[in-house]
Amino acid sequence: MNGGRVLLKSVSRSFFLSINFLPGGMKEAVSVAYMLARAADSVADTAKASSFVRLDLLRLMDRVVTGIADRDECRRCFERLGRDLAPGQTHEGERVLLQRYGECVAAMNALPAEQISLIRKVLHTIVEGQIWDLEFFGDGHEGTIRTPSKDDVLLYTYRVAGCVGEFWTELASLVLEEHFSVLSREEMLELGRHYGQGLQLVNILRDRAEDASRGRSYISDEPDVLAAWQSMARSWLGEGVAYSSALINKRLRFASVLPAWLGLETMDLDGILDGTTASEPKKKVGRSVVRRLMVRAFLFAWKSPQGEA
């Protein structure tokens, strides 16, 4: 994909930098999968478009990525994204991403068949989660907030994040083979799935006030309920550290453990879980903490792999 690295950098500089630490055989597939997922996320979050329009486009994008769509459907998808959704994006990188969505699909189709299959599976699952979100909450109007059941939230976190942990595991196992992990593939799939769900739970907990202002409430504000979700998030992030500890490849260990530590640091920020108002600036882990964690991750990467947390 011509200019793919530049496009990825414009969409997410932090993700672009983290890609550089991955083993060579994973970089292209992870980059393409990320851009396709980010494009779907941009569509799902475009509040200027009605939920009906977004749902229709997400289903069309799913057909395109999974290879079901014919040539006319593909052309219609690319045209609608570039004409109807891209101009309304406030993020310049996302605007260009939607305009060049067809190139991202072409880049995916140029990958080895096994990698294409993995990307199609994870993107289909992610879009299922985004569709559920839009169908459940609709266009989101303050004052008409619904809260899904625990089972719904768990399924949602799997679809939009847990499946990414599985994708990461399956791709790394495919590329690295016996040099992937000291644990079995099945154990790593479970750890990776929970790791992804834990990261998504951190996002949900952190963004409660902002989501409520958009008519979304994924979890109740009752103290006991919040405490249970917080405990689950910490436990699953701990599984993320265990996942990373079991990896053999040093580059992969470095890239894999950082999000878990950043997630735990996020949960420890003052007031981050107290339901502050949406008008307040979103709290983030400071740069000095990120640098400290990167040094810690570098040292962590050189340790011998461990088969348990």
Placement of each model-derived feature along the sequence:
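Catalytic cores of Mg2+-dependent Asp-rich isoprenoid enzymes
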Residues: M1-L199, L205-A309
